From Swiss-Prot:
PANTHER family: GLUTAMYL-TRNA(GLN) AMIDOTRANSFERASE SUBUNIT A, TRANSAMIDASE. It is an enzyme of class 6 (ligase). This is Glutamyl-tRNA(Gln) amidotransferase subunit A. It holds the Pfam family Amidase. It comes from Staphylococcus epidermidis (strain ATCC 35984 / DSM 28319 / BCRC 17069 / CCUG 31568 / BM 3577 / RP62A). Keywords: ATP-binding, Ligase, Nucleotide-binding, Protein biosynthesis. Heterotrimer of A, B and C subunits.
Length: 485
């Protein structure tokens, strides 16, 4: 097997045993990118010169047996809405084309401390608004399992690059499913941590009460290793939680006998395709065979997740994106004749159609005549959804269901139909609204397109999710499939 498909754990072992140099790993990764990414189109920018320089510095430390850091010499790809100092960060938007940050995000500082190596920035839906990576201003990323299909979104580049063996891990952001849904479509492992588990400092905000950064990998243990590296309280983010337990790997191999798992009947209901239902039911039987107890439950407010999510997220986006005015930074219209024209033209020319749609929706929902009818009511629904989960978690350890209602759809199939596109978030948005952790792991395929199983946990109980996911992975995984892509 090529180095490009090795796990973080295996690469770390090879580096620690001096069987391979960090610079060899990085050069192998760039060779893979040159071979594969012209087709997949997962990267927006590469930082090759700095990456090789950093890897060669790590070679010297390796020779001196000074291999500090959990991710020493491990290559990484970062979603392009996460600030990277001195590396262009565009959010896949014309609005930020050419923007080079002068500071580092907290997650990047943490990863640098662990001696990971930045390979480049990954494609996404513009400002993380979309479910297919088709709203990117620069390019459309393809699904490595089927080049006629989307990779999902908004972290489509992050999932596609990992599946194609172009990086062992990537970071994405998840506002309503943007890590888990592309992980499902691309047959990889994607974790949306509990809200507050990972610092958002340096994440370009979409919806501040929903956004969360998380890792995407090809196996469960690698995912847990990366989350350990990026978790922790941060003085720069007032919403980051002071939770001490960031050990997700020590108990990961523990069995799940006696664990109580809830399967909501709504998660296998209307809108979920038959092939997804079949795969998830088979996955549930696998969990039972591993000793877990699985019962059917109800989360009655699930159907209100999408409408309440899109009102809340769009409202927050309309405020967060007000900073892009054509004056301080970002796209600046050359044709404007007045200050008012500058605002209007810079924003209308700099933002894509989906971003403008959500700004309009959010501004409408926050307007004085409609605030109570839409925004306030949506926040009440959010509370009801959280209460549903709280009630289930009084008796159960984990909630299980599909990650997405269908497998990946074809490129161009839904981009002009926003309501159909939004419906793909049916099973992921409630997790963000409730602030809970959720992980997607591969559980099947239909016509060559992967299907993801979603596991949802109690607040700050990512450890249990990793245990269940790890045990399930011993029975079903796509490890042998990646190299054949």
């Amino acid at each position: 097997m090529s180095i490009r498909f090795e796990s973080i754990e295996k690469l770390t072992e090879l580096i620690k045993n001096k069987e391979i140099k960090p610079s060899d790993v990085v050069k192998d990764i760039y060779a893979a990118i040159e071979e594969t990414d012209p087709t997949i189109k997962s990267f927006l920018a590469l930082d090759k010169e700095n990456a090789i320089k950093k890897a060669e510095e790590l070679d010297e430390l390796q020779a001196k047996d000074q291999m500090d850091g959990k991710l020493f010499g491990i290559p990484m790809g970062i979603k392009d809405n996460i600030i990277t100092k001195d590396v262009e960060t565009t959010c896949a938007s014309k609005m930020l084309e050419g923007f080079v940050p002068i500071y580092e995000s907290t997650v990047m500082n943490k990863l640098h401390d662990e001696n990971a190596v930045l390979i480049g920035k990954l494609n996404m839906d513009e400002f993380a608004m979309g479910g297919s990576t088709e709203t990117s201003y620069f390019k459309k990323t393809l699904n490595p399992f089927d080049h006629t299909a989307v990779p999902g979104g908004s972290s489509g580049g992050s999932a596609a690059a990992v599946a194609a063996g172009l990086v062992p891990f990537s970071l994405g952001s998840d506002t309503g499913g943007s890590i888990r849904q592309p992980a499902s479509y691309c047959g990889v492992v994607g974790m949306k941590p509990t809200y507050g588990r990972v610092s958002r400092f340096g994440l370009v905000a979409f919806a501040s009460s929903l956004d969360q950064i998380g890792p995407i990998t090809r196996n469960v243990k690698d995912n847990a290793l990366v989350l350990e590296a990026i978790s922790g309280v941060d003085a720069n983010d007032s919403t980051s939680a002071p939770v001490d337990d960031v050990d997700f790997t020590s108990d990961i191999g523990k069995d799940i006998k006696g664990l109580k798992i809830a399967l909501p009947k709504e998660y296998l209901g209307e809108g979920v395709s038959e092939e997804v239902k079949t795969s998830v039911k088979e996955a549930v039987e696998t969990l039972k065979s591993l000793g877990a107890e699985v019962d059917e439950v109800s989360l009655p407010n699930t159907k209100y997740g999408i409408p309440s999510y899109y009102v809340i997220a769009s409202s927050e986006a309309s405020v967060n994106l007000a900073r892009f005015d054509g004056i301080r930074y970002g796209y600046h219209s050359k044709e404007a004749q007045s200050l008012e024209e500058l605002y209007k033209m810079s924003r209308s020319e700099g933002f894509g159609e989906e971003v403008k749609r959500r700004i309009f929706l959010g501004t409408f929902a926050l307007s004085s005549g409609y605030y109570d009818a839409y925004y306030k009511k949506s926040q009440k629904v959010r509370t009801l959804i959280k209460n549903d989960f709280d009630k289930v978690f009084e008796s159960y350890d984990v909630v299980v269901g599909p990650t997405a209602p269908t497998t990946a759809f074809n490129i161009g199939e839904e981009i002009d139909d926003p309501l159909t596109m939004y419906a793909n978030d049916l099973l992921t948005t409630p997790v963000n609204l409730a602030g809970l952790p959720g992980i997607s792991v591969p559980c099947g395929q239909s016509n060559g397109r992967p299907i993801g199983l979603q596991l949802i946990g109690k607040p700050f109980d990512e450890k249990t999710l990793y245990r269940v996911a790890y045990q399930f992975e011993t029975q079903y995984n796509l490890h042998d499939a990646y190299e054949n892509l």
